[in-house]
Amino acid sequence: MFSSKIRDLRVERDLNQEEVANGIGVGKNTYLAYEKGTQSPKLETVEKLAKFYGVPIAELVSDSETNIDEKLKSKIRMIESLDEPEKESLFILMEALLMRSKSREIQKEFR
């Protein structure tokens, strides 16, 4: 699970939550929520966590109990190979698609 993976990485490196939060540019309470699993980070924050810990994004998001399918793992590796401006463009597009999807769900609820 993502929350336990980032907690384990932090503990392995003998860091406190505030150090990690500062390292990735979020507040301590936000990072605490990531570790508790009560809040999910944006994709760009997952990328920052991966860089901070020096691990591939796939290691953070893959779950040994539920195994992300190989197609998704392949896509994550492709994203990791992009340069920063390309990643930023992709993340903006993904956020827009997710917001559009959420908006459609909300509209359906009020019909």
Curated annotation (Swiss-Prot):
GO molecular function: DNA binding
Domain HTH cro/C1-type: residue ranges: 6-60
Lineage: superkingdom: Bacteria
DNA-binding region positions on the chain: 17-36
The entry's keywords: DNA-binding, Repressor, Transcription, Transcription regulation
Statement: the UniProt record of this protein carries the keyword Lipid biosynthesis: no
InterPro entries hit by this protein: Cro/C1-type_HTH, Lambda_DNA-bd_dom_sf
SUPFAM superfamilies: lambda repressor-like DNA-binding domains (SSF47413)
Cited SMART domains: HTH_XRE (SM00530)
Keyword DNA-binding applies: yes
Cited function: Transcriptional repressor of the integrated CTXPhi phage gene rstA2.
Protein name as catalogued: Cryptic phage CTXphi transcriptional repressor RstR
UniProt source species: Vibrio cholerae
